[in-house]
Structures are given as structure tokens and as C-alpha cells.
């Protein structure tokens, strides 16, 4: 049993390696190109995964087209994008690691309380990466940087769910 615990810690440690300055720059610059599209980002997530939309009481059971242009939708989309923007802005600087860990840990705790699953976080990731890859200059280097950033984030979030 101890072996598996150590193995799990080694895997998480290997996954959760900080972004280099170059990787952080790729994530930050690509995010900057789309972060003003809050409503479109959240709409893309909901369109791809209606089960995620169903987790939001104010949007559950409603047609996406009927809520996309509402103030409530824009407000929530801005909250999500602002959170991502804050974490992304802190990335690439090792002295910010504890701040990122605190923010992302709270994200996991908050979403556990709402019954969000690791699978739904995976769906969010898939939808976000699909959105990014269709709206920014997306090459292997950008994809690798985003995958590393998301791996790091999910290594903190998923165990808390």
C-alpha cells in the first residue's frame, strides 16, 4: 500500500512541474487573445457538455441560446474567465506557486461542495482546449504548454473533488 502512495506522489510530482518562463509566456499570450470572449468561452463549454450547464441552477434545463445573451450568463462567464486569468497571470514565476496552489485548491473545494466530478473537470478542459485551438495561433508548442498548465492545475483540483 505504501508503494502505491509513493508512486502516486511521484506521478503527481512529475506532472506538477512548474511552467518554464517560455511555457508561461505561450499560455499567457494565447489566453490574452481570447480572454475578452468570456461569453463565447462559457457557451462553447455548455454546448459541448450540457451536463456542465446542468450543474448551474440558474442555467439548468434552459436552452443555451436563450441564456447566452443574459446578464446572469455574462456575469458567470466573467467570473470563470477572471479566475483563469488570475491563475494564468501568476504562472511562470515559482514565487507565486503557493498563491496558485491556494486558488486552485479552493476551486477544487468549492466544486466538490457542488457535486462536480473529476470527469466534468475533464470535459471542461476538453472544451476549453477545443475553443483555444480554434481561436488562437495553435501549434505543438502552445498545445504542450497548455497541457502542462492544465495538468498542473488538475493535479491540485482532482484530488480535492
From Swiss-Prot:
An example GO CC term for this entry is:
extracellular region
Keyword Heme found: yes
Name the domain of life.
Answer: Eukaryota
Signal peptide location = 1-16
Record keywords: Heme, Iron, Metal-binding, Oxygen transport, Signal, Transport
Ligand binding (heme b): 76, 111
Q: Which InterPro entries match?
A: Erythrocruorin (IPR002336), Globin (IPR000971), Globin-like_sf (IPR009050), Globin/Proto (IPR012292), Mb-like_M (IPR044399)
According to the entry, every stretch annotated as the Globin domain falls at: 18-161
Assembly and oligomerization: Homodimer.
User: Which PANTHER family would you find in this protein's record?
Assistant: GLOBIN-LIKE PROTEIN
> What's the further remark here?
There are at least 12 different components in Midge globin.
Family note: Belongs to the globin family.
The protein's name is Globin CTT-VIIB-3
Please name the source species.
Answer: Chironomus thummi thummi
